[in-house]
Swiss-Prot record:
GO terms for biological process: translation. GO terms for cellular component: centrosome; cytoplasm; nucleus; ribonucleoprotein complex; ribosome. Residues 18-34 have a biased composition (Basic residues). It comes from Salmo salar (Atlantic salmon). It is found in: Cytoplasm, Cytoskeleton, Microtubule organizing center, Centrosome; Cytoplasm; Nucleus. GO terms for molecular function: structural constituent of ribosome. This is Small ribosomal subunit protein eS7. InterPro entries: Ribosomal_eS7 (IPR000554). Residues 18-44 are annotated as: Disordered.
Length: 44
């Protein structure tokens, strides 16, 4: 389950436009786990 979730997250990350990606990197520095959890919930 985890590997598939991470794989889907990576796909979403590549699809995202540049500005969103930039803000996401900024948020990742603050709290990578909560950011990932939010993305997972959105995917579900």
């Amino acid at each position: 389950n985890w590997s598939s979730l991470i794989f889907s997250l990576n796909l979403q990350r590549r699809i995202l436009p540049k500005p969103t990606r930039k803000s996401r990197i900024k948020n990742k520095q603050k709290r990578p786990r909560s950011r990932t959890l939010t993305a997972v919930h959105d995917a579900i």
